[in-house]
Amino acid sequence: MTAGGGGDGENLVDWVLSAYELDTGISQDALIVLGPFMQTDLQESFLRRIDNLKNVEAITFDSHIEHLIQHASGVVAMGGYNTFCEILSFDKPGLVVPRTKPRLEQFIRACRAQELGLLSCLQGDSIREPRAMATALRQLTQQPKPSEVVLPGLLDGLENINKLVANRLAKKRTVPLELVRKITS
């Protein structure tokens, strides 16, 4: 679980911890990345709670979080652009809890991705019921990976660029390319 930079991810961390505290039968181990910008007193409070949970660990920051994501069985995140792209590119089941303030960017992205079947989404602005999060965590590793969802062209950007360039280069020029302009007097 990643709270991004941590400056506004405390609600997500609290909700995930509340789910593990309520439902001790969640079998999936959790590594919570608090983020370097989370307030120290909040970090300490979360770490005390984590000390009481057998299958939850935490770190403040990892400069190579992509390695953690690569080895994860699923990712819980707020749904910022970078993390969203990592969920897709590393082909991980994702549970996104987007923020809606100060912008709707994460919310729009997460809702559309859920509609397409790429990940699941919980709305974090409503009442954060620990049971709802526990259920979502239990279901996380059962949901399809993004690559199992057939959406033609979703991650074909490089292939499409190659095709467009090849098509352009294959076209014959109707006007010859002049390297030297003739000067007439």
Model regions and ranges:
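Short acidic active-site motifs
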Residues: 42, 63-67, 82-83, 132, ...
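Class I S-adenosyl-L-methionine
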Residues: 43-51, 111-115, 138
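A donor-sugar binding/catalytic signature common to diverse glycosyltransferases
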Residues: 64-108
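C-terminal amphipathic helix plus adjacent low-complexity
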Residues: 131-185
